[in-house]
Amino acid sequence: MSEELSQKPSSAQSLSLREGRNRFPFLSLSQREGRFFPSLSLSERDGRKFSFLSMFSFLMPLLEVIKIIIASVASVIFVGFACVTLAGSAAALVVSTPVFIIFSPVLVPATIATVVLATGFTAGGSFGATALGLIMWLVKRRMGVKPKDNPPPAGLPPNSGAGAGGAQSLIKKSKAKSKGGLKAWCKKMLKSKFGGKKGKSGGGKSKFGGKGGKSEGEEGMSSGDEGMSGSEGGMSGGEGGKSKSGKGKLKAKLEKKKGMSGGSESEEGMSGSEGGMSGGGGSKSKSKKSKLKAKLGKKKGMSGGMSGSEEGMSGSEGGMSSGGGSKSKSKKSKLKAKLGKKKSMSGGMSGSEEGMSGSEGGMSGGGGGKSKSRKSKLKANLGKKKCMSGGMSGSEGGMSRSEGGISGGGMSGGSGSKHKIGGGKHGGLGGKFGKKRGMSGSGGGMSGSEGGVSGSEGSMSGGGMSGGSGSKHKIGGGKHGGLRGKFGKKRGMSGSEGGMSGSEGGMSESGMSGSGGGKHKIGGGKHKFGGGKHGGGGGHMAE
């Protein structure tokens, strides 16, 4: 019965399945394709699962172990990768950070700083070298080194470019004005005072009174001052110099006192050589005056020489009208010749003031000279003190014109010192003292060259050659021509040095006025050949 019962449900199930297939044919289809659709056949899938697990049921206890092993291995691998990555990153950071610091933010600023510093050192060194060169150049100039031995620094802008000469000359002019003005003025004032004292001593040694020597010394200073004003004459100096050779013949007949006044007139010849034809007219009129002076006393002759010298200088820039002015004054000098020493001194010094005003006035200076020649008659009545004060004012007038030529102070001192040499009785002693004074005169010339900066303003040549004339026209004024000829040669060399300094300044008038100075001393001196040699030397040096 139990077997039947056990078989009945199975048969019943089979019957039900069959009925179900017949009733629901899609169910049988789904069951048949259950392997293709396991989601639909839950029972079969569960059965197969259990069958697989039952097959690998021995691996089930190892599943957790496998998970632990896989996790541990993976963790170790990832930790290794992380360590390698972090180590590489740390190494890269350690290496790249110094490289970045060194090469990117430091090297570029360091390079820029190096370039800037190198440029700064280079520029600073060049500026420093230029500054040192300028300082040494200025120190050498102050010490009296010649310009050709003391060239300016090569790095200066005036030495490079087209306008080098103009800029350099402007620099020299400005330095000359700032440097030599007070110095030359002090020297001029001192030499004007000491020149009068030397004139007194020279007058004491001479045959005539000391008063004449004093007036003569003041003449030399006034003529030296005015000789600088006429340094613009140029070639016309030759005519003025030649015209004075005629006076030399007349002066050769005069006595020593007249020779001394002739010496002052030879300074007028130097001014005339610079002034042009007006100097010629002045010299001819003075040759007539020299005849009158030969008859007059020394005081009157000296006063005539002074007035003549200053009158000739008043026409230095005036031209031909100044010649007429000098001739008119030659007539008035006859009236002045009758006056005493005080009157002659006052007239002469007033003439010096007139000469300075005429040199500045140009063509109107001739008229000024003529008009003031009338005033000189009134001034002739003044005392000696007034004329001395006039002399000081005249020297100040010369300094007011020192912008035209600073070297007038130094060279006027030279002419003043040399002008007094001829007053000595003994030619040998006079020659020795002449040598010393000639050296002092050359020193005056050097000071003049410092003041004028070697002819930078064009009037250093007049200073140098006036010193030369001052030395040369004393050769004929002495008794012993041999000794004085030698010393005159040295003085002539100092004059030629003045001419050379003027030629360095680029002023051609210095050379030609020097040659004129040499020519007018040929007839004026006793040693005509010596004078000719000196004159030729002056012309050669000036060229």
Swiss-Prot record:
Gene Ontology annotations of biological process type: anther wall tapetum morphogenesis; pollen hydration; recognition of pollen
Region (Hydrophobic): 68-162
UniProt KW Membrane keyword: yes
Annotated function: Lipid-binding oleosin pollen coat protein required to mediate pollen recognition by stigma cells and subsequent pollen hydration. Involved in anther tapetum development, especially for the physiology of tapetosomes. Also implicated in the formation of pollen coat.
Listed transmembrane segments: 68-88, 98-118, 119-139
Protein's membrane topology: Multi-pass membrane protein
Residue spans of biased composition, Low complexity class: 220-229, 345-357
Pfam annotation, one family: Oleosin
Compartments where located: Secreted, Extracellular space, Extracellular matrix, Pollen coat; Lipid droplet; Membrane
Post-translational modification: Proteolytically cleaved following anther tapetal breakdown.
Sequence repeats: 220-223, 227-230, 234-237, 259-262, 269-272, 276-279, 301-304, 305-308, 312-315, 319-322, 344-347, 348-351, 355-358, 362-365, 387-390, 391-394, 398-401, 405-408, 410-413, 414-417, 438-441, 445-448, 458-461, 464-467, 468-471, 492-495, 499-502, 506-509, 511-514
Official protein name in the record: Tapetal oleosin GRP-17
Tissues where the protein occurs: Flower specific, especially in anther tapetum, pollen (at protein level) and flowers florets.
Main subcellular localisation: secreted
Region (Polar): 1-67
Domain of life where this protein originates: Eukaryota
Disruption phenotype: Delayed pollen hydration and impaired competitive ability due to a failure to interact with the stigma. Abnormal anther tapetum development.
InterPro entries: Oleosin
